[in-house]
């Protein structure tokens, strides 16, 4: 089990990367389990936790993905739905939000934003047989390209 920020998580990550030198990615599920408990300003605490993990990632030249939950309340901006303060989204290099309107449903929207990436949104459908999210629409691609892909798939099928 992972330690929390300020209580051993840095050493755990460093030791793991030392024992597995080809490590490029660490996934922490969930961020809440390793957060510091603080009576400080909530924004400052959130930003400090993210900055701490970012400094470890930069030092070890790895990516750290934090799994975190969304608020139940709706908002036009998916980043505003991330639970906690904007210190979480503001401190990270990139943010990804998977929004599933219905837990049991197969449809979702995936939003990406960050310092070094273009903003992007995708409509997805979860294939329960293959266990893979299929891209239905992608803001990064022009509709013509998607239409060509769909047409090519239909022609190939026929």
Where are these regions (language model features)?
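Short amphipathic alpha-helical interface segments
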Residues: 143-158
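Conserved inter-motif catalytic segment of the P-loop NTP-binding fold
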Residues: 1-40, 48, 55, 129-130, ...
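Phosphate-binding/switch region of NTP-binding enzymes
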Residues: 25, 44-134
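Alpha-helix initiation/capping motif
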Residues: 41-42, 71, 148, 152
């Amino acid at each position: 089990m992972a330690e929390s920020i300020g209580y051993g998580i840095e050493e755990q990550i460093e030791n793991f990367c030392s024992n597995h030198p080809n490590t490029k990615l660490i996934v922490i599920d969930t961020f809440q389990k390793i957060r510091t408990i603080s009576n400080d300003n909530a924004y400052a605490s959130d930003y400090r936790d993210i900055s701490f993990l970012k400094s470890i990632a930069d030092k070890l030249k790895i990516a750290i993905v934090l799994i975190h939950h969304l608020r139940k309340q709706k908002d036009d901006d998916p980043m505003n739905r991330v639970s906690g303060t904007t210190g979480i989204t503001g401190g990270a290099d990139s943010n990804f939000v998977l929004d599933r309107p219905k837990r049991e449903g197969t449809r979702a929207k995936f939003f990406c934003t960050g310092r070094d990436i273009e903003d992007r949104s995708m409509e997805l459908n979860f294939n329960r047989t293959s266990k893979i999210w299929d891209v239905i629409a992608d803001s990064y691609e022009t509709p013509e390209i998607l239409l060509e892909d769909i047409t090519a798939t239909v022609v190939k099928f026929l």
